[in-house]
């Protein structure tokens, strides 16, 4: 978390971010805490940082993949980015529990923010059954999802 507070430029910060992501993050608390600390650091650099996140999603390190997912969850569930976020999330294939939970959590949060875009995405998704069911569970546990939407999502689980 100290890396997020370093008094360096955005360009100088990226190598610290990469090193932390690839070598220090080793559990969900490191991942989620680090991602939450980056708000001020990426402000004004959202588009370029969104591109930078691709490297984490493509990593062999499951914790780096989770960092990429949680960064998108925290900062990119907006109308401008959501279609690309869903596409990137859909492309992640992992058997690692915390990566899969990150996918489900991101999708449930995205549903709460923009149901219509997510509903369109669900018509052609490539999620594995476990992630899909977990997404539905997480969305149905959310107070931000309407009763009608919860019923709709539960109906998808049965298909």
Each PLM stretch: what is its role?
Residues 1-159:
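Alpha-helical scaffold domains
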């Amino acid at each position: 978390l100290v890396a997020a507070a370093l008094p360096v430029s955005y360009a100088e910060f990226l190598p610290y971010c990469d090193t932390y992501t690839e070598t220090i993050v080793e559990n969900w608390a490191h991942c989620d805490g680090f991602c939450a600390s980056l708000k001020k650091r990426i402000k004004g650099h959202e588009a370029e940082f969104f591109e930078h996140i691709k490297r984490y999603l493509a990593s062999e390190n499951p914790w780096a993949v989770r960092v990429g997912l949680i960064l998108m969850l925290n900062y990119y569930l907006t109308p401008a980015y959501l279609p690309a976020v869903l596409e990137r999330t859909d492309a992640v294939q992992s058997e690692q529990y915390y990566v899969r939970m990150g996918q489900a959590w991101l999708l449930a949060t995205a549903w709460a923010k923009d149901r219509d875009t997510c509903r369109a995405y669900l018509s052609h998704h490539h999620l594995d059954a476990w992630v899909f069911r977990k997404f539905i569970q997480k969305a149905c546990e959310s107070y931000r999802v309407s009763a009608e939407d919860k019923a709709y999502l539960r109906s998808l689980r049965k298909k």
